[in-house]
Design a protein with these regions (language model features):
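N-terminal accessory regions of S-adenosyl-L-methionine
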Residues: 1-23, 32, 135-136, 145-146, ...
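Conserved acidic residues
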Residues: 22, 86, 113
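A short SAM/SAH-binding and catalytic strip from SAM-dependent methyltransferases
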Residues: 87-99
Length: 185
């Protein structure tokens, strides 16, 4: 590929959205990038974001003032699988979900409009777990078979995939994997 995406496609997708009220589940929303991007856009829609994050971040963000006129945000510690969303946005986080197959199958069971899986380490390899050095700690990290992800989300159709270059130490590049077999990269 001669192109890469540096952030989520969700804000651009909303430009062609016809609905006046849009519900978004933002799983692994981290620093609330989606909220801030949408808040800066001239969108004539009401957007409600359920931001699903770990408890420490939810507790931190609940103390802040995030809402603006068009975009409202709720902070949740667990994904609401019973709620129907227009957009389910999973970015930079699926690789840390231990029971990821069950998680995706529960999402698949609902009638969401779109599911966006952004910055997930996936390819034509088998799914495997390794360790990642993360702020001085080693944590489990899953590398996915893209075919297996598609099987878990069989009520949806894969419409686009691209190489994602992540910003690592200030430089956009692919994940360093020289220590893995070539078939697993």
């Amino acid at each position: 590929l001669n192109q890469f995406i540096a952030s989520s496609p969700l804000p651009i997708m909303l430009l062609n959205e016809n609905e006046k009220n849009i519900n978004i589940a933002d799983f692994g929303s981290g620093s609330q990038e989606i909220f801030f991007q949408l808040s800066l856009m001239d969108i004539k829609k009401k957007i409600n974001i359920d931001s699903i994050e770990v408890e420490a971040l939810v507790n931190f963000f609940e103390k802040k003032k995030f809402n603006n006129k068009q975009v409202k945000i709720n902070f949740l510690k667990k994904f609401n699988f019973k709620k129907k969303y227009d957009y389910v946005h999973i970015s930079d986080s699926l690789q840390y979900v231990y029971d990821w197959e069950n998680f995706l199958k529960k999402i698949n069971a609902n009638d969401h409009k779109y599911i966006i899986i952004n910055n997930v380490p996936a390819g034509k390899n088998k799914t495997y777990i390794t360790k990642q050095k993360f702020y001085g700690k080693e944590i489990p990290n899953i590398f996915f078979s893209s075919d297996k992800i598609c099987k878990c989300l069989n009520n949806f159709k894969l419409t686009y995939k691209s190489l994602f270059l992540n910003k690592i130490n200030g430089v956009y590049r692919s994940y360093p994997q020289d220590n893995f077999n070539k078939r697993d990269r």
